[in-house]
């Protein structure tokens, strides 16, 4: 595993409501966490990050909104008994959504570019329209057209989403995201992985305006582990990992020091993986 390929926080700094999104097309917009055990998941993330969970009631299938210090992080959905298009059980996992201007048009564009539609465009009451696709590399990605809900809120405090990245064996995925999401992919130069091989990184937007990254992970990770990853900020790596273990989670890789924070890949008790980033423990580039 290498360090993340981007800045310490995504570019979007927004409010959560409004008739028109303040996010640019292709920037990170929303997160969904799928689980088969809501109570255990709430206990785990509440203990690790101090998150609050708001049950939306029977009309929304008891989905939850996730908040950190009152600021929106994303949504929680119980997928027990649900299956995907191939009939397989839906796994517990974190899903990333990118902001778009027209869910129908962008989904059609994605199909033309080789994507498969997993969930066709649909309205989520007045909050917005969403769709879920599988890009040509096999990675799932959500599309969010904002209505009254703009997206998650970046606060810069521990518990906030701080970075998103697509880990892939197919670096040519960049062409898909440029065509479908108007991504402005900027090379970060070639780094080195732990084996001493070159690693190719890009970010959507340059420098501090970057909203997510794309990393060539061939030779770093098995192909079946590829996909989108989300990073959450923590104040202390040591304290966060102690909470992860105590509450039934596991450490998958790291910690790894980087200029963007101390990064550790972990999994919750349902084996949904994510990364924690202690931005205050960042190392100096040299």
What is the meaning of each model-derived region?
Residues 1-23, 284-286:
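Actinobacteria-biased recognition of intrinsically disordered, low-complexity terminal regions
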Residues 2-6, 51-89, 136, 140-147, ...:
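Conserved short beta-strand elements that form part of the metal-binding/catalytic scaffold
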Residues 12-16, 22-25, 29-71, 112, ...:
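Core segments of cupin and vicinal oxygen chelate
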Residues 24-26, 89-92, 125, 157-160, ...:
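Short glycine-enriched loop/turn motifs at secondary-structure junctions
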Residues 28-32, 45, 51, 91-100, ...:
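Short, structured motif recognition centered on aromatic/hydrophobic residues
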Residues 36-39, 67-72, 96-136, 170-171, ...:
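Vicinal oxygen chelate
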Residues 119, 150-154, 184-185:
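Short helix-to-loop capping/linker segments positioned immediately adjacent to catalytic or ligand/cofactor-binding
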Residues 146-168:
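Solvent-exposed, charged amphipathic helical/linker segments at domain boundaries
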């Amino acid at each position: 595993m290498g360090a993340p390929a981007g800045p310490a926080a995504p570019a979007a700094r927004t409010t959560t409501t409004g008739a028109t999104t303040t996010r640019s097309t292709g920037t990170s917009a929303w997160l969904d966490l799928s689980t088969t055990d809501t109570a255990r998941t709430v206990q785990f993330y509440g203990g690790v990050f101090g998150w609050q969970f708001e049950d939306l009631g029977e009309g929304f299938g008891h989905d939850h909104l996730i908040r950190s210090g009152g600021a929106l992080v994303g949504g929680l959905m119980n997928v027990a008994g649900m299956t995907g298009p191939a009939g397989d059980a839906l796994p517990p996992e974190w899903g990333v959504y990118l902001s778009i201007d027209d869910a129908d048009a962008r989904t059609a564009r994605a199909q033309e570019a080789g994507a498969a539609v997993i969930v066709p465009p649909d309205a989520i009451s007045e909050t917005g329209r969403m769709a879920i696709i599988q890009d040509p590399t096999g990675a799932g990605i959500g599309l969010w057209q904002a209505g009254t809900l703009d997206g998650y809120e970046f606060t810069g405090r521990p518990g906030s989403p701080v970075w998103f990245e697509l880990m892939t064996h197919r670096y040519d995925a960049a062409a898909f995201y440029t065509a479908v999401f108007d991504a402005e992919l900027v090379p970060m130069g070639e780094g080195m992985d732990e084996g001493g091989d070159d690693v190719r990184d890009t970010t959507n937007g340059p420098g501090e305006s970057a909203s997510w990254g794309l990393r060539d992970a061939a030779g770093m990770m098995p192909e079946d582990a590829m996909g989108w990853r989300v990073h959450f900020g923590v104040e202390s790596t040591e304290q966060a990992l102690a909470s992860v273990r105590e509450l039934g989670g596991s450490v998958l890789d790291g910690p790894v020091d980087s200029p963007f924070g101390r990064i550790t890949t972990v999994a919750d008790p349902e084996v949904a993986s994510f990364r924690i980033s202690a931005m205050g423990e960042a190392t100096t580039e040299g």
